């Protein structure tokens, strides 16, 4: 998918740029005898944005669910994320398996964060994010992507599952749709899956 490729490339460029800016700032501080800031090159990520976006792309979680996610709901042993009912739109807890990409990114992010049972993503004040509109808009502009909302990453996740032949009911459960009709919008993306189903009658 071209948009996904552009988005990830833009995220990588942002990481490189922020590393360069931090190096420049630390040279300035060293020359004047000020305390150096943490070296971004020794960190897995320069901030929350890249792991937050990758998590969204690989789990289909809603933005609010990502903001509310706590480490206690991330099980690295069974490779699963619990979206608890109080934070889920449907009011029901669902479990989303983590693929290798998601597992690696969250593992690296956890090592970088202070050990706590708090939120996976916290703002500079240690509080819940309300939005990431400024950084999200900037990353899209740098990628040359237009008319793409944060919620579209959720659609992208579901579309890839449908095209891979995943059962629509499984997609519904992963997305946390309370209404099956909402999941049916992805049915047209799985023609091969439907063809194989009909061939079972031969």
Task: Place the predicted regions along the sequence by residue.
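DNA/chromatin major-groove-contacting recognition/catalytic segments
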Residues: 7-10, 94-97, 104, 108, ...
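Short basic/aromatic active-site micro-motif
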Residues: 46-51, 127, 146-164
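Short alpha-helical segment immediately N-terminal to, or the first helix within
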Residues: 55-56, 69, 160-161, 174, ...
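C-terminal catalytic core of Y-nucleophile DNA break-rejoin enzymes
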Residues: 1, 88-108, 117-138, 149
């Amino acid at each position: 998918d071209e948009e996904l490729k552009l988005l990830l490339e833009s995220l990588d460029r942002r990481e490189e740029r922020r590393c360069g800016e931090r190096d420049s700032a630390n040279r300035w501080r060293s020359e004047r005898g000020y305390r150096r800031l943490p070296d971004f090159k020794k960190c897995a990520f320069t901030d929350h944005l890249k792991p937050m976006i990758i998590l969204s792309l690989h789990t289909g979680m809603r933005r609010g669910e990502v903001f509310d996610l706590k480490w206690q709901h991330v099980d690295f042993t069974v490779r699963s994320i619990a979206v608890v009912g109080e934070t889920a739109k449907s009011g029901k807890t669902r479990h989303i398996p983590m693929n290798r990409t998601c597992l690696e990114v969250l593992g690296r992010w956890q090592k970088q964060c202070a050990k706590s049972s708090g939120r996976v993503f916290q703002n500079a004040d240690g509080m819940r994010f309300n939005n990431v509109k400024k950084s999200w808009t900037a990353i899209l502009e740098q990628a040359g992507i237009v008319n793409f909302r944060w919620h579209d990453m959720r659609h992208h996740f579901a579309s890839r599952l449908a095209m891979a032949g995943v059962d629509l009911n499984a997609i519904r459960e992963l997305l946390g749709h309370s209404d099956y009709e909402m999941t049916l919008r992805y049915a047209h993306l799985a023609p091969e899956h439907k063809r194989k189903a009909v061939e079972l009658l031969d």
